[in-house]
């Protein structure tokens, strides 16, 4: 029994050591993940997006397909594209990829591998008044509503004359799309710039709101809105590398 207790203690020590190592190199890990996710940097100057074989693979974090430098596809965008097609094919590939990532990593993806999560943390470091989210815990349930309706149901149920649904989250909600996709493409591509309209204005307003809130609150989009975070939060309970908050 003593030997067993000692073993459990040793396992706890190893777990704490691993956690400290991850925390120490967290900034480097996030920077590396962001660079790998957006490796095609020359495309920013070209005003075009990468369309190679890598776009058939989903990246783990929230990263827009339309970003000129994006090396892979956004899982949320990919899922909506498939379920919103005129033939409605359930996206087994994307769902399977998300489940695999969720089981293996859980919300580790949100804290270490997501470019937009990292951006919010950097914004929160801007000096100024900070507000707590403790009294706003009820808002954390919004992201599950967004996941169910904006990502799954609306693209399937609200369709046009040929039976195709809009990617509602990507089109009307996601601030990462306008930050990584619309803005850099419009800067470098006159044709895209001339085509910008009311939808771009709306998405830009959403982005500005998220930026302002990120300075005041810690990762507000992740906590309250992100459907990808909602999915990983559900999987975090069974993940091999879960994120736990210390009692202290």
Features from the language model and the residues they span:
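Non-ligating segments of multi-cofactor redox enzymes
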Residues: 2-248
């Amino acid at each position: 029994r003593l030997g067993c207790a000692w073993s459990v203690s040793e396992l706890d020590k190893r777990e704490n050591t691993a956690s400290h190592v991850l925390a120490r190199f967290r900034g480097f890990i996030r920077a590396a993940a962001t660079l790998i996710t957006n490796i095609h940097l020359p495309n920013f100057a070209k005003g075009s997006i990468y369309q190679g074989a890598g776009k058939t693979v989903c990246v783990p974090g929230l990263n827009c397909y339309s970003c000129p430098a994006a090396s892979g596809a956004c899982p949320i965008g990919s899922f909506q594209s498939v379920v919103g097609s005129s033939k409605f094919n359930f996206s087994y590939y994307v769902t399977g990829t998300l489940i695999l990532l969720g089981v293996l990593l859980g919300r580790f993806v949100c804290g270490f591998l997501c470019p937009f999560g990292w951006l919010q943390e950097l914004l929160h470091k801007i000096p100024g008044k900070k507000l707590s989210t403790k009294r706003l815990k009820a808002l954390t349930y919004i992201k599950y509503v967004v996941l169910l309706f904006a990502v799954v149901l609306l693209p399937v149920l609200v369709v046009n004359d040929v039976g195709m649904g809009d990617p509602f989250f990507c089109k009307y909600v996601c601030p990462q799309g306008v930050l990584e996709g619309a803005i850099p493409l419009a800067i470098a591509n006159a044709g895209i710039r001339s085509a910008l309209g009311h939808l771009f204005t709306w998405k830009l307003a959403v982005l500005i709101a998220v930026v302002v809130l990120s300075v005041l609150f810690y990762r507000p989009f992740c906590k309250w809105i992100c459907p990808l975070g909602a999915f990983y939060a559900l999987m975090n309970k069974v993940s091999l590398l879960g994120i736990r908050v210390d009692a202290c």
